UniProtKB/Swiss-Prot annotation:
The gene is slx1. This is Structure-specific endonuclease subunit slx1. The keyword Manganese does not apply. Its EC number is 3.1.-.-. It comes from Aspergillus niger (strain ATCC MYA-4892 / CBS 513.88 / FGSC A1513). HAMAP family: Endonuc_su_Slx1. The keyword Secreted does not apply.
Length: 424
């Protein structure tokens, strides 16, 4: 299945992650999954709400805890691909045991990665350091996949909630010579120690229940872009200085609140790639804004662009919510509609009927993830999804793949086929 056929019909999701689950009663029992709503998914695993998975339903292992999240996925398909690779390292093409490509920086073909080449991927077992189902093994595989050819180009970040898991992670990072890509951030949360790794723009939330899974982090950004692009008669690209025709070209707005830089998507991406550390990089990760000279994240701009161009209901809901927020802060809708002219852009001229129609869609329903994302899947769901794409074949994929839309909706939903590891 072509990823584009799935991802290009909806905006980039507000949040999607892969997670590592651990039993609090049998700490050797582990479970890998993916979800757009960690708190809801954890409640399902613990039997507090309907859903969950058959392998986490045993009372002798509940309650479960999410000890680690891999965040930043820009599509559900991408999260499922990473989930599958993490569950099945011996079958993933990104694992050196299968691709026969070994990281020379480790200086150890088999010992450092913890696996040995085998012609029977998925069946061979390495007896040198114990079962591949241990927490240590999962963290080693995670480190390997984050620096693999395919996943190392993704804007991912790690969020640790448990001190012991983070300590085991740092022990492995100190041991292995290969380094993670610089853009892969580590966020220490839960009972992890506070230190310089706690990024200012990625604050601690304390627990899984407090993770934001809607678009609230970019409400102001969405409203600003709507205001700046509301009058397309005289929009000019900051890079090429040419006029921007919004009906024919895609435009990007700097996500920084005090910056009003507008540019062509192609102009800005070319500029970012020209200054990228890796010359063969195809998609930017971040770059310097040509106006404010601050580092801005490419994924954030793509999320706003996808909302503006493909998520019309979500986009209008964000604008309505922002308007009501200002009205509440200033005491009246009239007072909230005046400052800086931004509020005047909330109601799109000529689209009054569309706004009225969209008002029937609840803001929470539009901005939150669908409840179907946690629906149970049949046992053969992986057969219909290309979970292990070969990077060498990505550019040669046929463009006219046909698929059953009803099946796609099931496939890309939150996986109930995650893997549980039980050493007890």
């Amino acid at each position: 299945m072509d990823d584009a056929e799935v991802d290009h019909t909806k905006p980039i999701p507000a949040y999607y992650c892969c997670y590592l689950l651990r039993s609090t009663k049998q700490r050797t029992s582990l479970y890998i999954g993916s979800t757009p709503h960690p708190a809801r998914r954890l409640a399902q695993h613990n039997g507090e709400s309907k859903g969950g998975a058959r392998k986490t339903a045993k009372d002798d292992k509940r309650p479960w805890e999410m000890v680690l999240l891999v965040e930043g996925f820009t599509s559900r398909v991408g999260a499922l691909q990473f989930e599958w690779a993490w569950q099945n390292p011996r079958m993933s093409s990104q694992h050196p045991a299968n691709r026969h490509q070994f990281d020379l920086e480790t200086g150890d073909v088999a010992g450092t990665s913890g696996v040995q080449p085998s012609t029977e991927a998925g069946k061979a077992k390495h007896r040198g350091r114990g079962s591949r189902r241990s927490l240590k093994a999962h963290l080693e595989d995670l480190h390997l996949f984050l620096r693999s050819t395919y996943f190392s180009k993704w804007p991912l970040r790690l969020r640790f909630f448990n001190r012991d898991v983070y300590q085991l992670w740092t022990t492995w990072c100190d041991r292995v010579d290969a380094l993670l890509p610089e853009h892969v951030r580590t966020i220490l949360d839960g009972d992890c120690p506070k230190d310089h790794l706690s990024w200012a723009d990625e604050p601690r939330v304390g627990s899984v229940e407090h993770i934001k899974v809607d678009y609230s982090d970019i409400y102001d950004y969405v409203e600003k872009s709507h205001f700046l692009l509301d009058d397309p008669s005289d929009l000019r690209c900051k890079i090429c200085q040419a006029k921007i025709a919004l009906s024919e070209e895609l435009a990007l707005v700097c996500p920084r609140a005090s910056c009003y830089c507008i540019s062509h998507l192609l102009c800005l991406s070319s500029r970012f790639l020209d200054h990228a550390e890796e010359p063969e990089q195809l998609v930017p990760i971040d770059g310097i804004c040509p106006l404010c000279n601050k580092v801005i994240q490419w994924s954030t701009m793509m999320q706003e662009l996808s909302l503006r161009t493909r998520g019309h209901n979500e986009f209008r809901a964000i604008l309505r919510k922002a308007k009501r927020g200002r009205a509440k802060a200033h005491g009246s809708v009239h007072e909230a509609s005046a400052p800086d002219g931004v509020a005047s852009a909330v109601e799109n001229p000529g689209s009054r009927a569309a706004c009225v129609e969209s008002a029937s869609v609840g803001v929470s329903d539009s901005l939150d993830v669908d409840n179907h994302d946690d629906a149970s899947l049949d046992e053969n769901w992986t057969e219909s999804l290309d979970l292990d794409p070969n990077p060498d074949e990505l550019l040669n994929r046929p463009k006219d793949h046909k698929m059953e839309s009803s099946r796609v909706e099931i496939i890309i939903d939150d996986s109930d086929c995650e893997e549980m590891e039980d050493l007890g």
